[in-house]
UniProtKB/Swiss-Prot annotation:
GO terms, biological process: proton export across plasma membrane
Name listed for the protein in its UniProt record: Plasma membrane ATPase 2
Classification of source organism: Eukaryota, Viridiplantae, Streptophyta, Embryophyta, Tracheophyta
Gene3D superfamilies in UniProt: 6.10.140.890, Calcium-transporting ATPase, cytoplasmic domain N, Calcium-transporting ATPase, transmembrane domain, HAD superfamily/HAD-like
Cytoplasmic topological intervals: 49-395, 446-461, 529-540, 592-704
Source organism of this protein record: Solanum lycopersicum
Similarity remark: Belongs to the cation transport ATPase (P-type) (TC 3.A.3) family. Type IIIA subfamily.
């Protein structure tokens, strides 16, 4: 748009008003067209994303859709599975806690029956844990002949084995979700209450329950329904949290990403896992998503607000995941969703960033945007940081490209209209080639990822670009005026004059303007790539080398080149030194202008710059971390991970309000203290479970 406006103004002024010749007018229009269009933008952005995608793949996150990198940089909510992502998915069973429900059956028999209902090859985590409890895995099929095995499926939620014993009698065993196994039992009404009591007891300790049932098949055919099912026992399954999950969740909160646990397990298990991981226990059953909860404390809350504030949901089915994503997106959140099953595909497709976890099904991988090759939450958070670094490079270049477009269009338009200076189009082409070749290296530049979710803030990008570009254009206009209209440079530095003459052909002046525009334009990238002073944040080596080479070439051209076809003549090393000094002096205000723009857009421009003098503070990065982590601090406070330390009241606050605030602060402090204690206790219990020790004995021996 700016290029079109500049060309229209030039056409109107040069031909009807100034009556310029046809050819010089076309040359001036070409200068705006060649120099103003950011020709390298598609290449730079594509190469940056391609290199970033390769980097993500090295970290264990394969990107299927390039634009997912931008969306992951802006992700502020991550809905994560519990099993395998937050936990190890390496189950253990405590035989001492096995509950027996049938007469004449002991815990060893329950384990054996569960092992018979398990695969001996291509095992999942549950099968591995159950069969691993036997002294010899071969015992699972010892003395029997397998007739038919029913694998697990999301509908039945159980496995079953039909087999013949040594006497030729047919039997059938099944293991799976307790509710499904309980529905098979002939005496369901008699044992239902006790079964639920045991399940709740296990859940309060973070243990999942696995039901086991047995029946005889007197007909001797695998298709027959068989005799009555006997519910013989419940096995407790412990899935320990990953050693890095708690720290990863804290990192996510500090990065402005709110992690929500989405699990199909019971609510008590979800809360216990959340307590151990320090991610909060503000979790709700899936019925709350449909407004069917019996909890009066949340019945009045809108479902959208409930989902936004919850730490997680339990008892979730795939259709619930889709609903969660849809409602979070309606609240203007950039939402990521993890999944592994066929039924997760709709939610993965709906999410802004669908993430197929390690060992996901082909359907889940197909519907996702990113496929993980490593388990755990840490690989996702690492991918978020890498995505933000990639996005920061693209954002830096975009601001640079806008600035250069404005400075070329405005600067050369003013020179052409005020002094009728016809800059050679060929030299603009040289500037574009050198600048674009240098800027290609930004795809591997060293940058600091944004500490908060980032996105394309067009107001910031265009405002910064227009102001910086306008400043650079004025630099060029002032330099031209000083060199062409005055004797300032010859008088101060002793160089030859470029002042207006009767036979002026602008050849040396064109070389001087070329060097001035080329050097300061390339130096601008150091301003746009940094959040603080440009000379504080160290750039990548490749960018520095490319800049030095390009500037050396530009300087040699300006000093020695006398090209009649380009209408330039060498200006010598004296003028080259003057131009470098001029650009260096006017370079430093660029950082100050950048700070002023940033503070103006934040809505707190003048009080920060003039009163608090943030731009001139001695704090590292000008207090950047303190300001940008305020949002993350608020999120951690909401989760009870720390006590708020901001000033909660003004001088006009009355005593009643002070008392209320004091009580609230006391309550939050107690919540934070209890959460830390629970988290520590959870770590201890996890270690005890993994070591196979007696938890009751250990609890008597340690205190928190």
């Amino acid at each position: 748009c700016s290029i079109a406006v500049g060309m229209i103004i030039e056409i109107i002024v040069m031909y009807p008003i100034q009556h310029r010749k046809y050819r010089p007018g076309i040359d001036n229009l070409l200068v705006l067209l060649i120099g103003g269009i950011p020709i390298a933008m598609p290449t730079v952005l594509s190469v940056t994303m391609a290199i970033g995608s390769h980097r993500l793949a090295q970290q264990g996150a394969i990107t299927k859709r390039m634009t997912a990198i931008e969306e992951m940089a802006g992700m502020d909510v991550l809905c994560s599975d519990k099993t395998g992502t937050l936990t190890l998915n390496k189950l253990t069973v405590d035989k001492n806690l096995v509950e027996v429900f049938a007469k004449g059956v002991d815990a060893d028999t329950v384990v054996l029956m569960a092992a018979r209902a398990s695969r001996t090859e291509n095992q999942d985590a549950i099968d591995t844990a159950i069969v691993g409890m036997l002294a010899d895995p071969k015992e699972a099929r010892a003395g029997i002949r397998e007739i038919h095995f029913l694998p697990f499926n999301p509908t039945d939620k159980r496995t079953a084995l039909t087999y013949l014993d040594g006497e030729g009698k047919m039997h059938r065993v099944s293991k799976g979700a307790p509710e499904q196994i309980l529905n098979l039992a002939h005496n369901k009404s008699d044992i239902e209450r006790r079964v639920h009591t045991v399940i709740d007891k296990f859940a309060e300790r973070g243990l999942r329950s696995l039901g086991v049932a047995y029946q005889e098949v007197p007909e001797g055919r695998k298709e027959s329904s068989g005799g009555p099912w006997q519910f013989i026992g419940l096995l407790p399954l412990f899935d320990p949290p990953r050693h890095d999950s708690a720290e990863t969740i804290r990192r996510a909160l500090n990065l402005g990403v709110n992690v929500k646990m989405i699990t199909g397990d019971q609510l008590a298990i979800g809360k216990e896992t959340g307590r151990r991981l320090g991610m909060g226990t503000n979790m709700y059953p899936s019925s709350a998503l449909l407004g069917q909860t019996k909890d009066e404390s949340i019945a009045s809350l809108p479902i959208d607000e409930l989902i936004e504030k919850a730490d997680g949901f339990a008892g979730v089915f795939p259709e619930h995941k889709y609903e969660i994503v849809k409602r979070l997106q309606a609240r203007k959140h950039i939402c990521g969703m993890t999944g592994d099953g066929v039924n997760d595909a709709p939610a993965l497709k709906k999410a802004d960033i669908g993430i197929a976890v390690d060992d996901a099904t082909d359907a889940a991988r197909s519907a996702s945007d990113i496929v993980l090759t490593e388990p755990g939450l840490s690989v996702i958070i690492s991918a978020v940081l890498t995505s933000r670094a990639i996005f920061q490079r693209m954002k830096n270049y975009t601001i640079y490209a806008v600035s250069i477009t404005i400075r070329i269009v405005l600067g050369f338009m003013l020179l052409a209209l005020i002094w009728k200076f016809d800059f050679p189009p060929f030299m603009v082409l040289i500037i574009a080639i050198l600048n674009d070749g240098t800027i290609m290296t930004i795809s591997k530049d060293r940058v600091k990822p944004s500490p908060l979710p980032d996105s394309w803030k067009l107001a910031e990008i265009f405002t910064t670009g227009v102001v910086l570009g306008g400043y650079l254009a004025m630099m060029t206009v002032i330099f031209f005026w000083a060199a062409y209209e005055t004797q300032f440079f010859p008088r101060v530095f002793g160089v030859s004059t470029l002042q207006r003459t009767a036979t002026d052909d602008f050849r040396k002046l064109a070389s001087a303007i070329y060097l001035q525009v080329s050097t300061i334009s390339q130096a601008l990238i150091f301003v746009t790539r940094s959040r603080s002073w440009s000379f504080v944040e160290r750039p990548g080596l490749l960018l520095v080398v490319a800049l030095i080479v390009a500037q050396l070439v530009a300087t040699l051209i300006a000093v020695y080149a006398s090209w009649s076809f380009a209408a330039i003549e060498g200006i010598g090393w004296g003028w080259a030194g003057v131009i470098w000094l001029y650009n260096l002096v006017f370079y430093f205000p660029l950082d100050i202008i950048k700070f002023l723009i940033r503070y103006a857009l934040s809505g707190r421009a003048w009080d920060l710059v003039l009163e608090q003098r943030i731009a001139f503070t001695r704090k590292k990065d000008f207090g950047k971390e303190q300001r940008e982590l305020q949002w993350a601090h608020a999120q951690r406070t909401l989760h009870g991970l720390q006590v708020p330390d901001i000033k909660l009241f003004s001088e006009a606050t009355n005593f009643n309000e002070l008392n209320q605030l004091a009580e609230e602060a006391k309550r939050r402090a107690e919540i934070a203290r209890q959460r830390e204690l629970h988290t520590l206790k959870g770590h201890v219990e996890s270690v005890v479970k993994l070591k196979g020790l007696d938890i009751e004995t250990i609890q008597q021996s340690y205190t928190v």
